[in-house]
Structures are given as structure tokens and as C-alpha cells.
Amino acid sequence: MVSALREAPLIRVHSSPVSSPSVSGSRRPVSCLSSQSSALSQSGGGSTSAAGIEARSRALRRRWCPAGIILLALISLLSCLLPASEAKVYGRCELARVLHDFGLDGYRGYSLADWVCLAYFTSGFNTAAVDHEADGSTNNGIFQINSRRWCRNLTPNVPNVCQMYCS
């Protein structure tokens, strides 16, 4: 059993060992990081005592597992994509098509080019754009509608003419 421990790399992920069957059918601890135990045992060095094995185990628990790093990176990437799915940044022609479909071409005397120009210079065609004013109100969305009068933004006692939330 001691010789099997010398030859097999003893590695733990977090603090629980993961076992896999070896060639002889017994189970041995395995992980994604290898220790130097096989190199030490071949050169005659290394400790086979329980204290030596425990010291090596503690040292290995402090290291990051590459699989763990990959999982962390994947979770981070996915969490970055979630909020982005709620907002949209339009292209110039795409926004012009949408505004035309909603009948804004010629609305109140303003051409489609005027609406597209307004959207570009106020929000950069970004539907999630929010600008905070000095008085505590916010300008929201692609046309930067102000929360002081037109929509409700968690501030009590505002007119809320459109009867809707700014978000």
C-alpha cells in the first residue's frame, strides 16, 4: 500500500479526494494537479509517513485547479451575458426601420432622420442608456426620457405622466 502511494500522485481538489481505479483495481486519489511524490520516491527522497502525506495534502488544497479556473471563467462569462440580453444597441438602419414601422416618420412634423439623429446623439442607439442628473432624476432609454415628469423611477411624488416605470 505504501508503494502504491509513492507511485500515485496524491492530489485533492478543495478538501475531498476524488478516486479513480488504478491498473491493479484498487482506488487511488486523483485530481487535475500532480504532486512531486513520484519524482521524489524514484530519487529516494520523500516522506511516506502520515504526517508527510497530510502536509502534501494541505499544500495541494491551497493551489487552484485548472478545471476550477475554467469553470469560474465560464460562469463569469455567462453572468456577463445575462444582463446584456435585456438591452439592445441598434444599428442606424435597423433603428430607422423600427421607427418607420411604428409610424414615427413625419410624426409631429419630425422626419425619420430627425428621430434617428436624436437617438444617436442622446444614447448612441442604446436602449439601456441611463444618464443621472444633478437633481436625482434620470434620463432613460434610447431617447433619454426624463424621470422627473414622464416616468416613475422609484422616486415618490413624481407626476409620471406616461403612467409607467422608467425601466
UniProtKB/Swiss-Prot annotation:
GO molecular function, one term: lysozyme activity
Pfam annotation, one family: Lys
PTM: The processed form derives from the membrane form by proteolytic processing.
Residues covered by the C-type lysozyme domain: 88-167
Sequence ranges on the Cytoplasmic membrane side: 1-63
InterPro entries, sorted: Glyco_hydro_22 (IPR001916), Glyco_hydro_22_lys (IPR000974), Lysozyme-like_dom_sf (IPR023346)
Keyword terms of this UniProt record: Cytoplasmic vesicle, Disulfide bond, Membrane, Signal-anchor, Transmembrane, Transmembrane helix
GO cellular component terms given for this protein: acrosomal membrane; sperm flagellum
Example GO biological process: fusion of sperm to egg plasma membrane involved in single fertilization
Transmembrane segments: 64-84
Membrane topology value: Single-pass type II membrane protein
Residue spans, topological domain Extracellular: 85-167
Signal peptide: none
Cysteine-cysteine disulfides: C151-C166
Location(s) in or outside the cell: Cytoplasmic vesicle, Secretory vesicle, Acrosome membrane
Residues the UniProt record annotates as site (Cleavage): A87, K88
Main location as per UniProt: membrane
Entry similarity comment: Belongs to the glycosyl hydrolase 22 family.
Subunit structure: Interacts with ASTL.
Function: Sperm surface membrane protein that may be involved in sperm-egg plasma membrane adhesion and fusion during fertilization. It could be a potential receptor for the egg oligosaccharide residue N-acetylglucosamine, which is present in the extracellular matrix over the egg plasma membrane. The processed form has no detectable bacteriolytic activity in vitro.
Name by which UniProt lists this protein: Sperm acrosome membrane-associated protein 3
Primary gene name: SPACA3
